[in-house]
């Protein structure tokens, strides 16, 4: 069974890379079930998270949320803080797509705190950018700027937009209060 689960996992990953998101989601589900049957709950949860991302890419946020639900707890029990944060981020992304912004914001903030504790700056930066966007949409401009500032602080801004934002935030920080 382990070989079969690995084969299906690889097929699902290949389909995902080819943008066959719905088919990939189905195969990730099959792989998750095989891992579950062999008692490998961590790998099963990882497959559910991959399934969630595939559903989100296919435009089905409700199924994405359902697929990722509870996986953060599996990772928390195993002590894998990084995967726990990623699972929370996947759930938050689905909630955001469903328009459930306060819930999404809460999960993004939990994910950010977990990632900060691991020193994982790139993923945390991505999460903080989502937090910034949600704060801006809710009319909390200063909180949005603070989140974006934090998002760009620990990583080297790569895109022209990020470089401009960094310069603007530096200017604002020098002039403020």
Where are these regions (language model features)?
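Tandem repeat protein-protein interaction scaffolds
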Residues: 37-38, 45, 74
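TPR/TPR-like (Sel1-like) alpha-helical repeat modules
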Residues: 105-113, 117, 125, 129-159
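Amphipathic alpha-helical segments of tetratricopeptide repeats
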Residues: 29-34, 69-76, 110-114, 119, ...
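Conserved alpha-helical positions within TPR/SEL1-like repeat arrays
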Residues: 6-19, 26-33, 42-57, 68, ...
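TPR-adjacent "capping" and linker segments in tetratricopeptide-repeat scaffold/adaptor proteins
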Residues: 1-7, 38
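Structural signature of alpha-solenoid helical repeat scaffolds
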Residues: 39, 79, 119, 156-160
């Amino acid at each position: 069974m382990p070989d079969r689960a690995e084969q299906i996992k690889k097929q699902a990953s290949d389909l995902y890379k080819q943008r066959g998101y719905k088919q990939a989601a189905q195969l990730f589900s099959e792989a998750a079930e095989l891992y579950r049957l062999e008692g490998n709950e961590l790998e099963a949860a990882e497959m559910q998270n991959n399934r969630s991302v595939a559903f989100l890419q296919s435009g089905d946020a409700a199924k994405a949320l359902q697929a990722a639900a509870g996986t953060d707890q599996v990772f928390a029990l195993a002590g894998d803080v990084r995967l726990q944060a990623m699972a929370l981020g996947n759930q938050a992304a689905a909630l955001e797509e469903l328009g459930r912004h306060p819930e999404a914001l809460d999960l993004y903030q939990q994910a950010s705190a977990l990632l900060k504790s691991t020193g994982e700056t790139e993923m945390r930066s991505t999460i903080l950018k989502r937090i910034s966007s949600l704060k801006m949409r809710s009319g909390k401009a200063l909180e949005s700027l603070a989140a974006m500032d934090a998002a760009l602080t620990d990583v080297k801004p790569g895109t022209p937009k990020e470089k401009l934002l960094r310069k603007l935030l530096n200017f604002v920080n020098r002039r403020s209060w």
